[in-house]
């Protein structure tokens, strides 16, 4: 019988604790039905010593180490190979937790030394543990991956004082978590700006980062001229995002300029994707 990580974790816990009774769930129901493990009494599965022996053998067909040895199922495949027979069965994504950077006028500070990454079309992935975080001087977080790859085409729209920043992709899933972790350990004096779609969802992303540490949001300098009928406006996208207005409106301590932008976006039903924001000219930086 082939078992997944969830089933193996459940079996490992029972073997570690030498548990004789467990609540029925999908895993134990399957093991009882397919392998006649345990006896069902009411809503529990009762395990004998011989049942535990069978479970230990079954566990050993998937895992090299004894059940008493704890390992991280989210580790990379090289680390997982020390424990799992099938190293591909882990939960880790190869690049899932790495931070993706690009730059024009900045070096990427690593613990092993500074790295030159300012080449057109070049992005660099690095784990947080290898970053010399204390040497990051300025950071711009970008929502869109394509914008990161093509940074050399549009960076001059960023205010001059921000053009020597490191540019970081916000990512999705585990990438987002890594970005949050970076923000938590950045030096307090390091300015951070967030450049997203010009819409409620983008403003919400920036606002959530601001809960971790103070950040600014980059918006089109011409934001006041963007109305519902603007050729780059996506009204239907605004409708999909209307749920975010309540959370944003309830944010305490929001700056007056940020309130004005939020009011404008909501009143005019604005949703301009970042690629289209890029067509609108210079950006301005607004403290949240």
Sequence positions of predicted segments:
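Nucleic-acid enzyme cleavage-core boundary/entry regions
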Residues: 1-189, 201, 206-288
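Terminal interaction module
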Residues: 195-197
């Amino acid at each position: 019988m082939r078992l997944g990580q969830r089933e193996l974790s459940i079996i490992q816990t029972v073997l570690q604790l030498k548990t004789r009774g467990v609540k029925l769930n999908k895993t134990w129901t399957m093991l009882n039905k397919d392998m006649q493990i345990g006896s069902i009494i009411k809503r529990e599965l009762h395990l004998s010593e011989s049942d535990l022996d069978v479970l230990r053998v079954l566990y050993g067909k998937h895992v090299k180490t004894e059940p008493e040895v704890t390992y991280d199922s989210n580790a990379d495949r090289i680390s997982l190979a020390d424990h799992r027979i099938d190293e591909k069965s882990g939960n880790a994504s190869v690049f899932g937790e790495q931070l993706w950077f690009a730059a024009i006028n900045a070096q990427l500070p690593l613990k092993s030394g500074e790295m030159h990454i300012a080449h057109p079309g070049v992005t660099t992935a690095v784990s947080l543990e290898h970053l010399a975080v204390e040497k990051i001087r300025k950071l711009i977080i970008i929502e869109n991956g394509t914008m990161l790859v093509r940074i050399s085409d549009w960076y001059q729209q960023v205010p001059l004082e921000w053009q020597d920043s490191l540019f970081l992709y916000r990512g999705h899933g585990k990438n987002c978590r890594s970005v949050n972790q970076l923000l938590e350990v950045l030096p307090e004096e390091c300015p951070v700006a967030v450049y997203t779609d010009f819409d409620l969802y983008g403003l919400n992303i920036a606002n959530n980062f601001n809960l971790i540490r103070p950040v600014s949001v980059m918006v089109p300098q011409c934001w006041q001229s963007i109305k519902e009928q603007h050729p780059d406006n996506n009204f239907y996208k605004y409708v999909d995002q209307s749920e975010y207005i309540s959370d944003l409106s309830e944010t305490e301590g929001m700056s007056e300029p940020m309130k004005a932008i939020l009011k404008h976006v909501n009143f005019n039903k604005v949703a301009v994707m970042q690629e289209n924001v890029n067509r609108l000219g210079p950006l301005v930086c607004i403290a949240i």
